[in-house]
Amino acid sequence: MNNDPNLEDVWWVELDLPAGHYEYEYLLINGNRISDPLSRRLTNGKTRIEIGAGGASTADNFSWQSDGYFRPELDTLIIYELHVDDFAAQGNGQGKFEDVIGRLDHLKSAGINAIELLPVTDFPGSHSWGYDPHLMSAVESSYGTPEEFKELVDEAHIRGMAVIMDMVWNHIRSSSP
């Protein structure tokens, strides 16, 4: 790895890799292994990236369909707060982003014009309300992929529904990078 002489704690590496899926983590001087603090996707606790042709990242290839979306006026918001795992579960506690999408029309017909998601950031373990986040830039993989999260937001916007996210910066897990 290379160190930027102008920025004491900034390290970088440049690799010529063929297109594919890659996982990495950082090995610290003290022997601890951590995920990239800016990870958008994790697999087994390791940062996962996808590299496309010519070395380009494929992370931002999502095709948004909700052109022209405008958030409802604040004084007109009718907010439904939900926990993805519990709200979308079919009695098994395994709710996913795609399951929430399947219930958006029901919420819309009830007059809801905004959903507030309890934390959807990565958390340790298999079940949590998200108030012990591990990485703030990665969605919880048991709910779905970053692309499936974007699809949820897009589908809500297509229906004229705002998406509010509960972010928990003051409860971040002590073992997080």
Regions picked out by a protein language model, each given a short descriptive name:
Residues D4-E81, D86-N92, D99:
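The feature marks proteins involved in alpha-glucan
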Residues N44-K46, D67-L74, H83-P177:
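Substrate-binding/active-site clefts of carbohydrate-active enzymes
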